[in-house]
Amino acid sequence: MEPGDDRSPLDHPTQQALDRAVDAIEAGEAVVYPTETVYGLGADATDPEAVGRVYEIKNRPRDKPLSVAFGDIDHATQYTEPTDRELAFMREFLPGPVTVIVDRKLTLPDMLTDGDPRIGVRVPANEIALQLCRAAGPITATSANRSGEPSVRQPADLPESVRQAVGAVIEASETAGTESTVVDVSTGEIHRRGAAVEAIEAWLDESA
C-alpha cells in the first residue's frame, strides 16, 4: 500500500483473489464478491457489454435496473448528481447497507436503468468490496443469484451456473443475508425495506 493509504491489509489468499477479480473486471468479465449484506455480482458499470453480461448471468429482465457500487462517496459523485439533501443522507449512512437513488450522469449507460435517469448507489461497508470498487469500480451491485432464487450468503451457496459464468470469485466469510434498504431521499420513499431501515426512517422524518 502507498504511504498514507487507509485500506486494511488483506490476507494473502484474499488479496490474490481480489487481484484476479480486478483483472477479470478490466477484461470485461463479471465477478462474485462479498458485501456486508449478501454476495454480489460485479462488472464494469460503465461498459454496456459487461452490464449486459450481468443481466444474462442472472437471467434478469432488462427492465429491472441494476445499482452501482463505489469505493467512497466522492467516487460516486463523479458518476452521479445527488442533491444537497441526498448527499447529506449519503454521508450519514454510507458506507453501509443502504442503496440511495440519485440522478446519474451519462457516463453510466442507459442499460443499467432501462433509460431511467436515476440510479441506485451503494458504498458497501465491507473492506474487500471497497477495495474492489476502488481498484476496478464503479461496478454493478446486484446479488449473485439467478433472478427469483435466494440470495447468496456464503460461497457454498453460489449456483454452479453463476460460478461457471464469472471470471473470478472472491470467497470470504458468510454474510449477514439482510438485503440493503433502497431509499429515494427526494421523495422520502423506501422502495425496499432491509438493513438499517429504522434509522433511515428516523432521518427522513427529522430532515423533512
Question: What is the meaning of each model-derived region?
Answer:
Residues 1-208:
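Active-site-adjacent structural elements in enzyme catalytic cores
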